[in-house]
Design a protein with these regions (language model features):
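Membrane-proximal, proline-rich intrinsically disordered regions
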Residues: 20-65, 303-314, 321-322, 520-536
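Conserved, well-structured interaction surfaces
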Residues: 39-55, 77-148, 163-176, 182-195, ...
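Hydrophobic, small-residue-rich alpha-helical packing segments that form membrane-like cores
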Residues: 153, 157-256
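Flexible, polar/acidic helix-loop-strand segments at domain edges
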Residues: 261, 318-402
Length: 536
């Protein structure tokens, strides 16, 4: 595919542009030289470099590890400091995210400044490329505001001197800009149905609607969430045709990339531009290395029984002696547990392979130390049998999909007027049907629930459907539920020594935002004061 070819180039080119792409450093390589901009192809290279800077697998897994879904048990790094309530403005993770995001914005501004130099460029192609770069810039600013709140904001390239005097702009102004940008560019972009095969993976009008909905979701602007989700649910002739992919596990199979559920993803190129985080999440017997990032028990406990009951409610058929039997099939598609039928669930040509994790059970056994799992679980979702021996995978990372649209719509309806049977039947029910539920109690609208009970059902459905996809931490932040979900003891399977797991601490007045990096404040005192709780 043409996009993957350009991304392969971008993977090399980004090193040249971004190595000096911090906000305070102006790059001096050929991409900023007027002489570079001689063809549409060269402009496309820079555009696709911006695509590669917008999001990546590392960010997704890092975000997930900050939530209550995953636990990075071997780390002694910045993430652990954040999770334990010990973060300071000097953490490298704060500095590196800041640098990388402004590096992507720098690429966008270079493109916007230089693209008019390209001779004989088709006007419609240029308009579309400009719309794509503006979408990428909006996405980068959205992430910046989610992490840091008020940040430096500018819409054209700035000089070194300007970068060391610019002040922070309030989040509300930046969010308003994002919404207007997305509204302004949508008509310059094709729908999913209009994309030629070689352009699969590029930004579409549907992706604009999905990002609009997600930005409004962070602000609990429910009416606008419903508006933009409705565009994708009920106006598909205008915004593109989307549907749930029939097989939940198959969504995360390289063979099914760019299917009808995918609104936006981060494209990779097998054997060329890859990601390798899975090597530290899978069983040692299947190619794992030092298992760092593993699911938490609280996530496992959220999956329903096939009967539709939770594991703890009255009348449940949950059996603690066989805790994974008769559970929501998405559990098996997402998490590897003790007694996991590997050969039955992973198409890698193996025969009769079972993953045993209980102490003393073999290579993958929990031992409370070493390189094995710290919670008694491994990660299944996004495992790629076609990856290299060291788990370098060319599988795309999904950033937006249609199930998320249905879940956002369901949440927005409930928070405004209350969930109804009609809305349930076009949102939660089809998601559960696709997952493999057949029992009426699981599929039918649960009448008689209180507002809070229904809210929890919707939130739990979102958690299990989107688990290990990088969204949970942001959901907790927007719900202002940090103390509920991000404080207290990390739990593992029944055979795990929980004394060896962390106790998390969430400071309500501080931890919804990261600190502005102290290195940036040292360069530019106008960035002070820092966010609450981090000092000046």
């Amino acid at each position: 595919m043409r996009l993957r070819k350009y991304i392969a180039f971008a993977g090399m080119a980004v090193l040249m542009l971004c190595s000096c792409n911090e906000m305070e450093n102006a790059p001096t390589n050929k991409f900023t030289d007027n002489s570079y901009w001689t063809s549409t192809t060269k402009a496309q290279y820079v555009l696709n470099m911006a695509y590669s800077q917008m999001y990546n697998a590392g960010r997704m897994w890092s975000d997930e590890s900050l939530s209550d879904n995953a636990y990075d048990g071997r780390s002694v790094d910045d993430q652990r400091a954040i999770r334990k309530g010990m973060a300071t403005p000097s953490l490298d993770i704060f500095k590196n995210e800041w640098k990388d995001l402004y590096g992507g914005i720098k690429t966008c501004h270079v493109f916007l400044e230089k693209v008019d130099l390209v001779p004989n460029m088709d006007a419609s192609v240029k308009a579309r490329m400009i719309a794509e770069i503006r979408y990428i810039r909006a996405s980068l600013y959205f992430r910046l505001t989610n992490l840091y709140g008020a940040v430096p904001f500018f819409t054209e390239d700035i000089t070194l001197e300007e970068s060391r005097s610019v002040s922070r702009t309030d989040r509300e102004t930046i969010i308003s800009f994002i919404h207007q940008e997305l509204e302004d560019i949508k008509d310059a972009l094709p729908t999913r149905d209009q994309l030629p095969e070689e352009d699969k993976g590029k930004i579409t009008k549907g992706a604009v609607c999905a990002l609009q909905a997600r930005v409004y979701l962070m602000d609990s602007d429910w009416n606008n969430v419903m508006l933009y989700c409705d565009n994708l649910m009920n106006k598909q002739g205008e915004y593109g045709t989307y549907a749930l992919f029939p097989d939940y596990a198959g969504l995360f199979d390289e063979a099914n990339e760019y299917n009808e559920e995918i609104i936006m993803d981060r494209s990779y190129v097998p054997n060329l531009i890859t990601w390798g985080e899975m090597v530290d999440m899978i069983p040692l017997s299947r190619g794992g290395r030092a298992v760092n990032r593993v699911p938490q028990q609280s996530l496992v406990d959220t999956y329903l029984m096939l009967s539709g009951k939770t594991i703890s409610e009255a009348g449940t058929d949950y059996n603690p002696a066989y805790p994974y039997d008769n559970r929501d099939p998405r559990l098996t598609a997402t998490i590897i547990y003790d007694g996991y039928d590997w050969s039955g669930n992973v198409d890698d040509g193996s025969k009769d392979v079972v993953i045993n994790i209980r102490p003393g059970s073999g290579t993958d056994a929990y031992d409370g130390g070493g390189n094995g799992t710290s919670t008694g679980y491994f990660t299944r979702k996004y495992y790629n049998p076609q990856a290299s021996g060291d788990q370098n995978s060319g599988m795309n990372i999904i950033t937006m999909r249609y199930a998320d649209i249905l879940l956002m719509y369901a949440e927005a309806v409930h928070e405004t007027s209350g969930m109804t049977e009609a809305v349930w039947n076009k949102t939660i029910r089809p998601i559960r049907e696709r997952a493999g539920f057949t029992a009426d109690a699981a599929l039918n609208f649960p009448a008689g629930k209180s507002k809070e009970e229904m809210r929890q059902i919707i939130r739990d459905e979102r958690r299990v459907e989107m688990a290990m996809e990088g969204l949970r931490w942001y959901d907790i932040k927007r719900w202002k539920a940090g103390n509920e979900y991000l404080s207290g003891k990390v739990r593992g399977a029944s055979f795990v020594d929980e004394n060896k797991l962390d106790t998390r601490k969430f400071e309500e007045a501080r931890d919804y935002l990261w600190a502005v990096p102290i290195s940036e404040i040292n360069l530019n005192p106008n960035l002070a004061p820092n966010n609450p709780g981090y000092g000046n």
